[in-house]
Amino acid sequence: MMRRYRRKNSSIPIIVEGRNDLASLRKLSFYGEIIVFNRGISITSFSDEISNKYREVIILTDFDNKGSFLKDRFYGYLTGMGVYVDLYLWNFIRKHVPIRTVEELPAEFEREVEKEIQM
């Protein structure tokens, strides 16, 4: 799953909430464009900027109430502006990985790798 999204990120940007989320994805070898939302602009202005520049994006906000709210708002605005929004990774992590924030992904990934090594 992660390998697939690393490849996908080489041509499609990922939207995250903050700089720490960006750093976490970099630790997981996501080297494509990652766009940080928390820059002091509104969701609608941010969505306008995104829709003017991209035809497809991946959303990876946190998995708490705020992150879920942002995901839903971005999805609504961006799809309404003709942008394809990929939520598969967000939904997969929310359902299968016991974390609440994107920042926790590297540590969780490391734990999973260690489990596999011990088997």
From Swiss-Prot:
The keyword Metal-binding belongs to this UniProt entry's keyword annotation? yes
Annotated Mg(2+) 2 binding sites: 62, 64
Q: Which cofactor does it need?
A: Mg(2+)
Q: Which Pfam families match?
A: Toprim
Question: Which SUPFAM superfamilies does the UniProt record give?
Answer: Toprim domain
So which domain of life are we looking at?
Archaea
Q: Which UniProt keywords apply?
A: Magnesium, Metal-binding
Q: Where is the Toprim domain?
A: 11-93
Q: Which residues bind Mg(2+) 1?
A: 17, 62
Q: Name one GO molecular function term.
A: metal ion binding
Cofactor: binding comment: Binds two Mg(2+) per subunit.
Q: Which family does it belong to?
A: Belongs to the UPF0292 family.
Extract the HAMAP family matched here: UPF0292
**What is the protein named?**
UPF0292 protein TV1259
